[in-house]
Regions:
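Predominantly a Rossmann-like dinucleotide-binding segment in NAD(P)-dependent oxidoreductases
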Residues: 1-110
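Glycine-enriched catalytic-core subsegment of oxygenase/oxidase enzymes
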Residues: 110-185
């Protein structure tokens, strides 16, 4: 739902939601990407998976509202965490129930996720080949707890990071089998 459910109205999902991720990969590798292979599908956010009796908008009395993970009332009215992304011009502490109800009543953010005319993938994997035979696999997936994670595997060790403000980067070196935690500052 929202701005990116339909390619004709926005862009393909990898461009709309993950172009900065692929830019970061290019920067980290420091080489030109020479080949790309991609697989992706829209398998879940489709009309056929809509709960029985689900209306066009969640606020219109959906019979599945109580147990729906994507209930717009829960996501935007009851908890303003995601609302701040939709209304970035309004300070988080000034987001009100009235603003949230307006969003879910009058924008695509209030539509049932299964009834949004979705035509973009809900998961996609890219296999990329860079110069010097560096290979990268990137996965964009709607079915997770949110966030960005990176795992770099090299000949001398590996690096793992959750790209947020609180989780340290972990560097593991094979020679001494040690982990180093690098705080995010």
């Amino acid at each position: 739902r929202g701005n990116w459910h339909n390619e004709a109205e926005s862009a393909c999902m990898i461009l709309a939601k993950s172009c900065h991720d692929t830019d970061m990969l290019q920067w980290l590798v420091g080489k030109k990407c020479t080949k790309v292979q991609s697989f992706g599908t829209l398998s879940y956010f489709t009309e056929k998976n809509a709960p029985e009796g689900a209306p066009e908008y969640c606020i219109q009395g959906c019979p599945a509202a109580e147990n729906c993970m994507y209930n717009a009332v829960k996501m935007y009215v009851d908890d303003h965490t995601y609302l701040r992304w939709i209304k970035p011009d309004i300070p988080h502490d000034e987001l009100t129930e009235e603003i949230a109800r307006d969003v879910i009543t009058n924008t695509d953010y209030g539509r049932c996720v299964f009834r949004c005319n979705n035509d973009v993938v809900d998961h996609q994997t890219l296999n990329m080949l860079f110069g010097d035979d560096v290979t990268v696999t990137f996965t964009m997936n709607a079915f997770n707890n949110g966030g960005r994670y990176i795992h770099i595997m090299g000949t001398k060790g590996e690096i793992r990071a959750a790209l947020n403000e609180t989780t340290p980067i972990t560097v593991h070196t094979f020679a001494d089998n040690k982990n180093e935690q690098i705080p995010i500052v």
